[in-house]
């Protein structure tokens, strides 16, 4: 045996106290603060009624602690951080605490007296006085517990005072009316309560983290022990308390609530911590002793391996088996430390008897022997034995019991450990270190609060809160992360688009009970979530974002996702949460799920409160004179549904009152809406008022989505003929230099374009996915007995709070069902009557839309940059308009001259004898050079030049009609296919862009013919516009039964002009077409035609482009559909076509027109037989 005393086995409790070495402060009182914190936690998680809670808070804290105890309470953090509070600040804090204690004693006595005789006016007045005194004292005192420089030493008493303040504010929220306070005062104090919950919570978390981060992270076990003690003791005295603060919200929690703490704390190292030079590093201990975030688990057993070194048996390693909440599946930990067999492995397991199936206490036996620098020996710092104690004080031994007691750090309440224990052993970790001649094996005990049980039990008479870390399964993409400090434990983080987690629930009710469900969450974007419990579901519900992207988690980051559809269930069930609108894999945080039992009365009261809150939120103030700007017409309808669904049995009077208020809100909404006929009583009812639209739009009555009429816009097969709906806001309704907003509700849509047009167009394309019927199959019929939609039946909800976020001109993949688009108005001019055009348009075959509750309202006056921007836009528009007026004058003059030249006189009822189709087309092209006859966004809406455009366009239509009347050939333009034509062999009629058709004769054996009745002895002109591709000839022949035959021939390159008056070659012919001075009547007509269409008789070799139509490119900028106005069936002939004609004098009353070819392809655009004028 070694003789040196320092090399002997030295019991742990014989060593100099480690804390004496660290801070020079005795340890004897260190558990007083823990007792106070744990006592308050026990009270907070209890189910006692509110009156008993008030008295209990006095008995446990404010009536039980005197100045000396408060002094010890302050010593706690001083000891841990090595900072003493100045004497003056300490005495001031203790005096304030004692003063609050004295006031609260008077307050609780007054409350007890009032409870005995609650209608006594004197006692009610006394309660009002005592509340006001208590509230004022706390409002004054709490800032003194946050003195600059002492925030961390005073943090525990700050939280105690804050807890008292919130408790008192909850009292007045619950009892205030019975004490005689008016409703306005109660609401004001309730607002104080909800505001201070956040302020007190965030303050405590901020300074807890600051204090923890200031602690040094060195000195091995000794430094880690101090760090861990700060973390554990302030978790108990600060974080545990503030995690309950949300429960003081009396309107959120109107009945007793079961609360659970799932966080873990770690007791001090049970080995010697004085010689930090030979122990593991701080980082090594922190990494090996502290568990990573995980689902909450419960201890099954510990299998301990024992090793032997220099005659000392010690705890060398172990494994832990456990199970998740409500799960029988065994979870095995990795091996901690080493595997050893100096003795058989010991399995440490608690009893399986309910209530005894845990360890609440450990008694550890450490061994320490310091190495000798002179005579080398092995330093040993290990644990030789531990006694694990059950609540009945039954003991399971690992080798032997020691004297290091975990109750010194986690004390019980009173003497009865069966009901007074505060924590249960949940896990054990181990840190092992070999350093030079020193060995350290450090088991660390992990504890969870007694409030978190191994079953998720939901009771039918209280609100049950279940932290979501008590799930038994997480899907891929979901994990557990460190809690932000105020949630009572860790939380769930997920980025999945689908199922998130599964948990086991045990409903204590044996018959079906209805519960409302809500989930506390934080999200940087809107989310759609549902909860399934067995066969019952809340259905999908949309919830708004609560925080900015990448923002830190504070108390304000979390909100409740409260589902309007409850569940009905009983017994044991498996529950799941799923998220369904997260294709971008955004991250959400989930804290806990809550179950609120409801009966008919509770549900009626809940619905009434919800309806009252919804109605009151419509108005800017309590006098209900003005609506809030952001309150939409659709929202008013939904609030009306809430009111309509209130129970006549429980709240008939309140329902009538709320109904009048919401009707008033609807009238105010109608008054501020500048749209005419916003409820769609009709479309195209009045020429100059209300809605104008395409004939395929349908108006439908209210349904499960809309309370009033809505419109359905179908898709279209031609983008030049879109489905459209529009209305003009008259200039007289607009105010100068104001911003206006168009908004409404879209049930679903695809490729819906929305425009607001004034100086320019504001444009969005919105795609809003629908979900089919709003009514799930599992609910009762949504149809009332008279066929009306039953809007009181729970139904699916989407994303009700997210505003449309697309920028101007973007095509959004997914929008909110609520849309809005704004436009700025500059100076108003009633003479110009510019107004604002509201346009909805669909120009795709796949497009569709169902929308209603449309509004156009005044949003706000323009100031600053917005005012400057609209003035610049207005000036730019006026400058552009002045240039347009000059250009229009020139173009109009040219176009009118060309149009007038088509007719004999100003009566416009007879064409000139030499007017041909090319001349009409040329004149029409000039007419279409008049810009802004119609809006480019929708060529049905008149622009500033519509009058002069339609004047000339009507005359062009007259000319075409007169010209068509002269053509005795039916369907000569093939726009009706082969109607009226006789066909032999195979031919095609190919429809070109913009409704133009051509005849294609692809084979030499094919023939197309038509028999025509004529007047014998009269003269006719046969005119053909065609194109020959490839070799051979294309022929159009006219003949009678016998003889009198003539024909027009077309070649790819003419060697000789076929006109009787012209014998030039192909090149001569092409050159001749450009001779403006030609006197030949046939050629003069062709000159005009070719000038109009820039004809080129040299054909392209490529077949397809030769008869594929070109488009006007000079009409309304980028809108190629604008020229459809009034001129649909006559299009410009593409380059490459040739027009030829001949004179024919029939001798009988019947002639035949025959079309054929000898080789290649023959493409015919038009065949005309015109009667010559006498």
Swiss-Prot record:
Q: List the InterPro entries hit by this protein, alphabetically.
A: Cry1Ac-like_dom-VII, Cry_V, Galactose-bd-like_sf, Pest_crys, Pest_crys_Cry1Aa_dom-IV, Pest_crys_dom-III, Pest_crys_dom_I, Pest_crys_N_sf
Q: Which GO terms describe its biological process?
A: sporulation resulting in formation of a cellular spore; symbiont-mediated killing of host cell
Record-linked Pfam families? Cry1Ac_D5 (PF17997), Cry1Ac_dom-VII (PF21463), Endotoxin_C (PF03944), Endotoxin_C2 (PF18449), Endotoxin_M (PF00555), Endotoxin_N (PF03945)
Q: List the GO molecular function terms.
A: signaling receptor binding; toxin activity
Whether Transferase counts among this entry's keywords is: no
Q: Which keywords accompany this UniProt record?
A: Sporulation, Toxin, Virulence
In terms of domain of life, where is this protein from? Bacteria
Which CDD domains does this chain map to?
delta_endotoxin_C (cd04085)
Family annotation (Gene3D superfamilies): Galactose-binding domain-like, Pesticidal crystal protein, central domain, Pesticidal crystal protein, N-terminal domain
Q: What does this protein do?
A: Promotes colloidosmotic lysis by binding to the midgut epithelial cells of many lepidopteran larvae.
Q: What other comment is given for this protein?
A: Toxic segment of the protein is located in the N-terminus.
Under the heading PANTHER family, the entry gives: ENDOTOXIN_N DOMAIN-CONTAINING PROTEIN-RELATED, PESTICIDAL CRYSTAL PROTEIN N-TERMINAL DOMAIN-CONTAINING PROTEIN
> What family classification does the UniProt entry report for this protein?
Belongs to the delta endotoxin family.
The name this protein carries in UniProt is Pesticidal crystal protein Cry1Eb
Q: Which organism is it from?
A: Bacillus thuringiensis subsp. aizawai
Q: What is the lineage of its organism?
A: Bacteria, Bacillati, Bacillota, Bacilli, Bacillales
